[in-house]
């Protein structure tokens, strides 16, 4: 991040509007948001709320119809696009669509080869990252022999290999089974706690959003709420407008007599065992 101004947001959107060429209304309508450096922000919303459009605008994949986007204090435009995209890594919903290499090792190596990293250094990076995501025993494995969760972990390792300052997780758990989802969320949590990255999670999953430092809620292309995850998720009006479900633990706790509603699994178990 630039040292010129430590208060500069890592990402800033100013009055951003976006309309698809085939659309009749704005997918994003006058959205202004700041993303602090080093924080984990979850963006919640139903299908069609504009959250995935937002992620693609931040990544420079879509150009706003109007409004401005700044990455690390620099305006995102044609002349700065390539430089700023090097600061951003994005992991998409379908793990099959982003596996480029013939094997796990090849996939992690792909971006490093493009950056002309020396082979010896590359080997060390691949081994280190594959261990961190729990895939070091599968380096010679082909993608068709991996589960969805394993493929997403490889995708995360491939992004980490490029060492971007910003990582966007775009519905990364929506196509995974419960085991795969748990593995990926654990990995995101580890990145949040141990790496100085600005993380953005695009999701409709409240169990994922509750891990974040901050939650933004979109509905019909507009920002309708922003704040602490627990406060946002307790706001039934916001939840209803956004058409999203409360986390499983919270729903269970609300059904139990003499138990205060909670999002904390350990706290719920403690209340039940009293």
Swiss-Prot record:
The UniProt entry, under InterPro entries, shows: AAA+_ATPase (IPR003593), ABC_transporter-like_ATP-bd (IPR003439), ABC_transporter-like_CS (IPR017871), ABC_transpr_CbiO/EcfA_su (IPR015856), ECF_ABC_transporter_ATP-bd (IPR050095), EcfA_1 (IPR030947), P-loop_NTPase (IPR027417)
Disulphide connectivity of cysteines? none
Molecular-function GO terms, alphabetical: ATP binding; ATP hydrolysis activity; ATPase-coupled transmembrane transporter activity
Superkingdom to which the source organism belongs: Bacteria
A GO CC annotation recorded here is: ATP-binding cassette (ABC) transporter complex
SUPFAM superfamilies for this protein = P-loop containing nucleoside triphosphate hydrolases
CDD domains in the cross-refs: ABC_cobalt_CbiO_domain1 (cd03225)
Gene3D superfamilies of this UniProt entry?
Answer: P-loop containing nucleotide triphosphate hydrolases
Task: Provide the residue positions that the database annotates as binding ATP.
Answer: 45-52
Annotated compartments: Cell membrane
Q: What is its main location?
A: membrane
Q: Which UniProt keywords apply?
A: ATP-binding, Cell membrane, Membrane, Nucleotide-binding, Translocase, Transport
Pfam families per UniProt: ABC_tran
Q: ABC transporter domain spans which residues?
A: 11-245
Give the membrane topology.
Answer: Peripheral membrane protein
Q: In the Enzyme Commission scheme, what number(s) does this protein have?
A: 7.-.-.-
What does it do?
Answer: ATP-binding (A) component of a common energy-coupling factor (ECF) ABC-transporter complex. Unlike classic ABC transporters this ECF transporter provides the energy necessary to transport a number of different substrates.
Q: Which family does it belong to?
A: Belongs to the ABC transporter superfamily. Energy-coupling factor EcfA family.
Q: How does it assemble?
A: Forms a stable energy-coupling factor (ECF) transporter complex composed of 2 membrane-embedded substrate-binding proteins (S component), 2 ATP-binding proteins (A component) and 2 transmembrane proteins (T component).
Name of the protein described by the UniProt record: Energy-coupling factor transporter ATP-binding protein EcfA1
**Gene name of the encoded protein:** ecfA1
